[in-house]
């Protein structure tokens, strides 16, 4: 694996000079192999090690390099044709392979090669970009978008129109992460490498980036870039120091544990916030 990483790191330093016509065989094969490993879930751009999320920057570099080594080409779809550098994940799938891998794909859901989809996942008409990881039992609902290299945990529900941001540029940014057993309400956006920790519930229409204040009304604490585990979050506003205006924020209205979540429906958690 170290040899593979070295090839990617070296190629990335001269990425501006790489084209589909001049890329050498070793570099092309290394990039293609990494994309295949991401596609099968053997590698992932970020993983939790000793309780902390670690981003493997060299894998993100490989994803970026993949755009340098391929020309656009026509791709056939059920309703239309496409013209892009990145092939579709399911282009070579037959019924046996779909059954073997154990997920559902509802037309016209689109997944790019290099994204991993785990068993028992349901993809409604949605979009999953290259480098993303979608774990077991997750629902990606209609018109939801899972951005490049985003990490989606087990038993997550991404509601209709949800946007999970991609972070290939800038390269130093960490991917957006939704941990296990989270619910993200319709039309919400989580971007810029924000981490939504396990068991959290994000209400409809909540927008969270790195600069968004995440206000815990019970403690008065303000978080940036992280929604603590078990949080129930709605959109809100915080006043300026002089009280002359207010600015948008996300508000943690309560905390719940797994036992409470198992007994109480999502809608009930969001209704009882007073």
UniProtKB/Swiss-Prot annotation:
GO CC annotation: cytoplasm
Keyword annotations of the record: Acyltransferase, Amino-acid biosynthesis, Cytoplasm, Diaminopimelate biosynthesis, Lysine biosynthesis, Repeat, Transferase
InterPro entries, sorted: DapD_Trfase_Hexpep_rpt_fam (IPR005664), Hexapep (IPR001451), Hexapep_transf_CS (IPR018357), THP_succinylTrfase_dom1 (IPR023180), THP_succinylTrfase_N_sf (IPR037133), Trimer_LpxA-like_sf (IPR011004)
GO BP: diaminopimelate biosynthetic process; lysine biosynthetic process; lysine biosynthetic process via diaminopimelate
Location in the cell: Cytoplasm
UniProt subunit comment: Homotrimer.
Annotated protein name in UniProt: 2,3,4,5-tetrahydropyridine-2,6-dicarboxylate N-succinyltransferase
């Amino acid at each position: 694996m170290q040899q593979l990483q070295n090839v990617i790191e070296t190629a990335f330093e001269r990425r501006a000079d790489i084209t589909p016509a001049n890329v050498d065989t070793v570099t092309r094969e290394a990039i293609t192999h990494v994309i295949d490993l991401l596609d099968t879930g053997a590698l992932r751009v970020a993983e939790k090690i000793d309780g902390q999320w670690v981003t493997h920057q060299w894998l993100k570099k490989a994803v970026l390099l993949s755009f340098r080594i391929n020309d656009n080409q026509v791709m056939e779809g059920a309703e239309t044709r496409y013209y892009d550098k990145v092939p579709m994940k399911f282009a070579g799938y037959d019924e046996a392979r779909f059954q073997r891998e154990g997920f559902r794909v509802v037309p016209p859901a689109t997944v790019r090669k290099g994204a991993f989809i785990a068993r028992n996942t349901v993809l409604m008409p949605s979009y999953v970009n290259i480098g993303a990881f979608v774990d077991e039992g997750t629902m990606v609902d209609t018109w939801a978008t899972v951005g490049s290299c985003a990490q989606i945990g087990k038993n997550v529900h991404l509601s209709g129109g949800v946007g999970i941001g991609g972070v290939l540029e800038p390269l130093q940014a960490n991917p957006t992460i939704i941990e296990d057993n989270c619910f993200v309400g319709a039309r919400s956006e989580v971007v810029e490498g924000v981490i939504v920790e396990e068991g959290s519930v994000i209400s409809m229409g909540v927008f969270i980036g790195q600069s968004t204040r995440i206000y815990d009304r019970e403690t008065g604490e303000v978080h940036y870039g992280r929604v603590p585990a078990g949080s129930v979050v709605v959109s809100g506003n915080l006043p300026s120091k002089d009280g002359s205006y207010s600015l948008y924020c996300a508000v943690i209205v309560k905390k719940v544990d797994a036992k409470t979540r198992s007994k109480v429906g999502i809608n009930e958690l969001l209704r009882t916030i007073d």
